[in-house]
Amino acid sequence: MTALQTHARALYVVLGCLAWSSPLLAQPVSDLPRAEYYVARELFRVGRTLEAADGFRTALNRARRVGEQRWVDSIPPLIMLGECHYQQGNLSLALEQYDAALLLALSNPGWIDQVEVQVEQLAELESTKKVNWLSKSRQTKTVVVPAGLQLSVDPTQAQPTPQGGVLAPVSLVTQLDVTEVLRTMSIALMRRWEVLGPLAKHSPLAAPLDAMFARNPMQVAPWLTASWKVLRGVSSLGSNAQVDARQLVREGTLIANQADYYLSPQALLVLGKLDARDGNYPAAIVSFQDAALLAAQFEQMAVVAESLSELSACAAASGRLDLLDPLQRIATWANKKSSSVQVAALIGAGELAEYAEDFVLADKLLRQAAVMLRGREVSLPRAQASLAYTTSLLAFGQNRRALGLTNLELALKFTRGTATTGAVVESIFQTQLTLNLLASNALTAAAAETILAEALAEPSERDWQLSPLEVLAELTTARDPAFIRLLELAISRGAMVDELVQLMDRAQRQRLYESLPLGGRLMAWRHALAGQPGQLLPEDRKVVEAALQRYPALLASGQRIESLVNQLRQGPLPLDERKLSADAKKAYLELEELSASFESQLAFLSLQRRHLGRVSPAAASLPNIQQQLEDGDVVIAFVMGGQQVYGVAIRRDQTHMWQVAETAKLDAALAGLLAEIGLVRAGKAALPDEATAPTAAWRATAEKLASLLFPAEVHTMLNTSQRVILIPHDRLWYVPYEMLPHTAQGGSAAWIVQRAVTYVPTLGSIELAFGTRPAIQRSLGIVGSFFALDPPSNDAAASVIAQSVPNSTLLLLSQKLSVAAPTWLKLATDQLWVAAPIASGENAWDAAVLPLGKPHQAHIGLWFETPRTSPAIVALPGLTPTLKQGQIGRGNDIFLPICAMLFSGTKTACISRWPVGGYSTKIFLQRELEELQTDRPSAALRRSVLALWTEQFLLADEPILLPAAKESSPLVPGNHPLLWSGYMSVGDWKN
């Protein structure tokens, strides 16, 4: 047991004794706050926040009361209890304590005027020689304000007034720790400014606090004047007060512009945060250094720890690696004094060591921090999150990618919070609170829109530099309802369609970003390094050039990877590892090693405190969309959040925006349609001849679904369309649009009869519907037990398909294979078709698209990674989303595989909402691959489906229709909806 642990345990024992002792045996009744408060504060100082919270609750229970009301001596324990919740990540509960404390101050506005202040020279603080690890920026003395001041009031005789205040007779003398009351009030005001952000100005407390602090105390003591300036300044940061808040805080850092005092550290911390937000890192660093030094002298360890964390962030963001040594000295000094300070210094020094590429030192420092945080008594989730983030950065810098991903996930887990604590990230908390206040009419629509727009905005350069982990947690958190509400507010305001399209696109892109561990940062770096420098925005080009100058191996590695890919593509397909040349194997091993190292380096860059715009996928622009559309094209896009659905239809010369009114009926209609065509069997399934009859039940349901989804204006736009480019969202990815009726009138033909249909992931990726036809030199088919139950028939069907495709190679999973590596096979193939079941759940990145050889290389999520070379044409008729089991999820099991393919180089893909299999799939797939040789993908799928309708199949050969009822006909026509309406053509090229 360390000395620090022994000290903390002794404090906890003392706290317990005080809690059970008689009031007469505790601190004298006139001394406030009670002794329990100071014991709890010591526990907080050493990082035992959970035990400290218990202590502050005990102090609250023993605090003075006036009738049923608390007095001002409850302010410190309330605020410090809030600090315990804040450190645990429970922003909501922390805010409750801060507000309760400030309400007490508002309820007792005259208490500060009852303080008996002696106008005398303040004693200088005895210098602590060992607190010299940083240079103080100003040559001022440091003075001690008496902690306990007399109040000419007896709170035991006080009575509440009708107005809610407190009236106390001047009889006895009470000793109150005024400096602690004021110091903790400054903490509460700062936290409200940070936690509430733009909401602070709309708080019911904002105006009363402004009024209270606008009235200066009657006392004229210089230290009290300085303290009041700090409180008023910090309060004004989160209000509409017409004052220079920063100047007030700056003036309050010194007593009469001469001496530092107990509130100087807190004021300097606030000034540093303001400068950091402005990007003035040199000034911020000076303020944080001074705050840490002074806080250490006053033994305000929480301020020391927070100042060091902020200092380290600014140092890393601005390249101040010279602060590495002082941070190490601070860590040594803090040993046996404060776990929170020591951990903050170690983590900050560790990150600076990583930027200096001294990974050995960084590893040593972070291991020391980990030992400190592993103690059972220490509970610092924010520090644990910071440690995991910094350890992840170290692992990526050392090319230990698996460890990096593990620690990153741990860091995000801490930062996202839990169902118990709620959101840890302020912007997420502000978003949810804004939605709640708007729903309860406590916030105007205009104010809510402004706040949501700020909270949901693309992270700024300053955000990435100061709080990269919090930004990543924010970007990887589902926020669909907030984006939908922002869209609704913009619609109510009468925003132009271009703005609405951009908001819809952001919601669609967010669905991709939230599923990626780095929130799209890796995609941004891959895009930046793979593209031409001239294609980047000037600010992004500057960042990339600086990174390449700092890490020149990046450019060389990228060029070498490209060379190796070209070399392997020119060689034979790696079908049999035993027949590969030594040179080919050597080239692939080098590529594999270099790619893994390159990905680690990209992750290292992505986690660093440097901004790079997330331009992949591109942001949407209505003029750009309309400019690309061909005559006869209609774009239809949706966004969905909860029970709210919005759609937009776009033609070259026309747009229409609408809200889907009856979403509950929409869900019921979709579920009914899937049941009526026989995909989901609840009770007796329809007979095949019933499902293909003109009066089949599903036809009426499809008409109802179409009428729910599309207003008359959109039906009119569709009537003259030749191709529909669909961009669904959420569970609308499961809708088989191809089988919806052509017109709003009953009995009309399905969409697929009248027009081609294609899909792209987001509005901003519309160019994926206008690609160029790729040159196909190698086609590869991978076939499992998919076309027939008996292997000979299945293999024969696969061979027929392969023979109809030029330059085709066939791999049968029923045979023993010696494929070297799925990744190698993927990069060497131009056209890939996989006739095998491919399970795709909510974690769709794990869908095993290449079920060969090394299992870890089979997942489609790896298609994003280096070497990012994917087959130009992909067919996955066996993709198996959760819809097959009757589960209507969030659509990620379709959306994410599409993103993986199209954003990694694939030009088009044919996938399925449900796997059909059997002989009908053999006929469809063969026709689809043949049509692709001469036609665009959307037209190829349409022609293949219509050709399928003319066929007759043995019911026994169609597993999706089995088991069948005894009265079923042995033959089933190819126009049975289950056999064709699940296929989707994703991505397209110009006509």
Regions found by a protein language model. Give the residues of each.
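Residue register of alpha-helical TPR repeats
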Residues: R34, P76, T225-S227, Q266, ...
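Single-residue signature of alpha-solenoid repeat helices
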Residues: A52, A94, L205, A245, ...
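An often Trp-containing, charged/polar helix-loop segment at the C-terminal end
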Residues: T921-N991
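Amphipathic alpha-helical segments of tetratricopeptide repeats
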Residues: T58-R64, A100-L104, P109-G110, D210-P217, ...
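A domain-level signal for caspase-like cysteine endopeptidase catalytic cores
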Residues: A682-D689, P694, F710, D730-L732, ...
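Amphipathic alpha-helical protein-protein interaction segments
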Residues: R401-E409, K413-R416, N441-G746, R773-I782, ...
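Catalytic cores of nucleophile-dependent amide-cleaving enzymes
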Residues: T758-I766, L827-R927
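Boundary/activation segment at the start of structured domains
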Residues: R652-D653, H729-D790, P963, V972-N991
